[in-house]
Design a protein with these regions (language model features):
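Amphipathic alpha-helical interaction segments
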Residues: 6, 48, 72, 76, ...
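Helix-turn-helix
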Residues: 6, 10-48, 52
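An amphipathic alpha-helix signature
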Residues: 8, 71, 114-121, 125, ...
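Solvent-exposed, amphipathic alpha-helical segments
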Residues: 10-17, 64, 143-150
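Hydrophobic alpha-helical connector segments
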Residues: 52, 62-87, 136-140
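Amphipathic, non-transmembrane alpha-helical scaffold segments
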Residues: 54, 58, 106-117
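Amphipathic alpha-helical segments used for helix-helix packing
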Residues: 83-107
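Hydrophobic/aromatic-rich alpha-helical bundle segments in the mid-to-C-terminal region
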Residues: 104-110, 126-179
């Protein structure tokens, strides 16, 4: 693992547990066990580090969500939360804390949101055999985002509820009683 990847991998859990705005550079250099000079040399400032962390997390997240059905999508989301923790959407938290004053962070969050929308559209099209209408896509996206948020206080029950609701929506859309 190169030093840049090492710093990013050590910074992510610090941001996840403590927030973006509240986390100082001293805490980040301690977590990565590097000097501030090394951190700045490889990643620039805090905003660049946050963007690199968001990009790495986005890649890992979408690798996990490389599935072909809506049911598998919610199963993958639950697996992600069990592995990574259920503290709500990392990207939404970054946007709320930093996006308003850091355009680079806002751009990372926007890229994530666009990719999530595209991924869900692809999975839905695979399930339906055709592109989903915008309403159904938005409904599945709301269930996905809602489960992500709700899992922070309801645990796995949030994923079961979202998965069940998504199955009902698909059944109603396709006219199948069991799917």
């Amino acid at each position: 693992m190169d030093i840049k990847t090492h710093i990013i991998s050590r910074a992510e859990p610090v941001f996840d547990e403590n927030g973006f705005a509240a986390t100082g550079m001293d805490r980040l250099t301690q977590a990565a066990q590097v000097s501030s000079r090394t951190l700045y040399k490889h990643l620039g400032g805090k905003t660049e580090l946050i963007c690199a962390v968001l990009d790495a997390r986005r890649q890992r997240f979408f690798d996990q969500l490389d599935v072909d059905s809506v049911d598998a999508l919610f199963a993958a989301l639950e697996t992600w939360a069990r592995t990574e923790g259920a503290r709500g959407c990392f990207f939404l938290r970054a946007q709320g804390e930093m996006g308003g004053r850091e355009p680079a962070v806002a751009a990372q969050v926007s890229n994530y949101r666009r990719e999530l929308h595209e991924r869900i559209a692809r999975v839905l099209a695979n399930d339906l055999g055709e592109a989903a209408d915008g309403d159904l896509l938005d409904q599945i996206l709301v269930l996905f985002e809602g489960a992500t948020s709700m899992a922070s206080y309801r645990g796995p029950a949030a994923f079961a509820a979202a998965r069940s609701a998504a199955a009902r929506l698909l059944n109603r859309t396709t006219g199948h009683a069991n799917q």
